[in-house]
Amino acid sequence: MIIHNNINFIGLKLNILNPKQIIKWSSIFYKNKIIIGEVLIPNTINFNTGLPILNGLFCEKIFDYMYKWNCNCNKKMYNINNFSFFLYCKFCKNKLIININRKYKLGFIFLNIPILHLWYLTGPLKVASLLLNKNVFYLKFLIYYKYFFSNIKYKQYFYYNKLFSKINLYKKKYKNIIQYLFSHNILYKKLQNINLLTELLNNKELLLINNKYYNKKYLYKKINLFNLFILNNIKPNWIFLDLLPILPAGLRPYFYINNSTYIISTINENYRLIILKNNKLKYWLYLRNNIFFIFEIIEKRLLQQLIDYLLINKLILKNNNTFFNFSKTFQGKYSTIKYKLLGKRVDFSGRSVITVNPSIIYNNIGLPYYISINLFKPFLINILKYNSKLNIIFKSLLINKNLFIIQKFLNRLLQNQFIIINRAPTLHRMNLQSFKPLLTEGYSLKFYPLGCTSFNADFDGDQMSIFLPLIKTSKFESNINLNFDKNIISPSNNKNLFSNLQYYKLGINTLLILNYNNELNIFYFNSIEKIYEYYNNNILFIFNLVWIKYINNNNIFYILTSINRIIINLYMYIY
């Protein structure tokens, strides 16, 4: 359930679903009539024509039509005058609008017996056992009809009439057989008759009387559960499934390959088996007095097991495949809730090794091209959206190519952007700072060496995480408070964090070395610009000796020096 006000989205709430709400979501209002989206047939499509079968798992009446402005009544591409005001076909009564409804329109299966939802039986709260005051093992014993499969005498093919006559004759012997025979219906009626307010008050009174720790813990759980049910307007019998919702047809599609061969999603097979068993159970219930009662019990057990496989999969098929199950979408690291709803930062973050780059300005950080292209991919797609000829797949392929125009777009994006850098473990505030990114080659983050003390980092393989601020408030905070030039002084001891590191001292020392062993091939230069030209083209190296022309009071001198001394002299002159 989505919670929102008139202005914007507030939050998301998970709740036990009301059966009436399932009918509302799956029904269509058409010409003062309500068309309910109940799936009756286990068939999916006609494999000869490739069209969905009526009242099946891909029915166009229930899940909306497949093609745009098209029907299955052999009348294609209607004139707009043939449509009603709401664009319904007059012949087959299908809705003729763009088929986006097929991705969110639900269907449902009307179950002939109420089936217990397995998450409320074996889940961490064990809701069913708390509500019914029964043990989980005993409830499993009831819903899977183990009483009839464990006792050999009930495996005999008794008729209902004979069974009830035996119950009347031997009441002591067959005392609890009714409870085991109609366990689903009896448990469902017990939950229907629960008054939540009276149960809550009774449990609170028992809590005052009881002194045992175990009983108190159990009563606390029950009181919390009843409070939750009352506050959220949940009825206890909703933990049983009267109606089984079916996912929209657009989320479990089928694809045509060739020679009348199709690929269909595995969840459709599970739904198909549930409908088959449900229809078979309906047939046995109709012929109850004329058949053996064990047939009905087998179908009830199989129906419960198939719905369990849909929720928590334990069934392995012959080809080592498994059915789709909904617990995968909520459990684990890559579940829908953890990965997509709670972990949205995963798509806008990265990690890389840091390497030294003294030529970079202290407030900047060198961001590799391959990281920046993945971080800013949604922004680049948004820029390319103005070209309507390109689809999303082609845009993403275009971005992955190292094109000059993409680099220009990236440089424009990075001009007013800040990225947050974190080094684990985050022991204090200085481990999280923001920098202005610059596009660089290679695969590592180019880091300013004097900023290492605040992060407690060095260049022996340390890794740093990259995060991209998205919201206006986080952008403002990263620009003002977290910025690197605002965190020069430590907040704990007021010391300058720009301390001279070992790397910095070694670098200055190497730039001051004058090696007289390289006396061969000493070049003569008239200007420093020419020396830099030779140095950048790898003709001269950092320790090579050179003679440079120096004029003082119209007197010409040639000074013997090295490239490294010229570099440090130039930097000292600039700064």
From Swiss-Prot:
EC code(s) of this entry: 2.7.7.6
Intracellular or extracellular location(s): Plastid, Apicoplast
Keyword list, A-Z: Apicoplast, DNA-directed RNA polymerase, Nucleotidyltransferase, Plastid, Transcription, Transferase
Gene Ontology CC: apicoplast; DNA-directed RNA polymerase complex; mitochondrion
InterPro entries linked to this entry: DNA-dir_RpoC_beta_prime, RNA_pol_asu, RNA_pol_N, RNA_pol_Rpb1_1
Primary location group: plastid
Catalytic reaction list: RNA(n) + a ribonucleoside 5'-triphosphate = RNA(n+1) + diphosphate
Gene Ontology annotations of biological process type: DNA-templated transcription
Segments traversing the membrane: none
Pfam families hit by this protein: RNA_pol_Rpb1_1 (PF04997), RNA_pol_Rpb1_2 (PF00623)
Molecular function as annotated in GO: DNA binding; DNA-directed RNA polymerase activity
Subunit structure: In plastids the minimal PEP RNA polymerase catalytic core is composed of four subunits: alpha, beta, beta', and beta''. When a (nuclear-encoded) sigma factor is associated with the core the holoenzyme is formed, which can initiate transcription.
Biological role: DNA-dependent RNA polymerase catalyzes the transcription of DNA into RNA using the four ribonucleoside triphosphates as substrates.
Family as reported in the entry's similarity comment: Belongs to the RNA polymerase beta' chain family.
Protein name: DNA-directed RNA polymerase subunit beta'
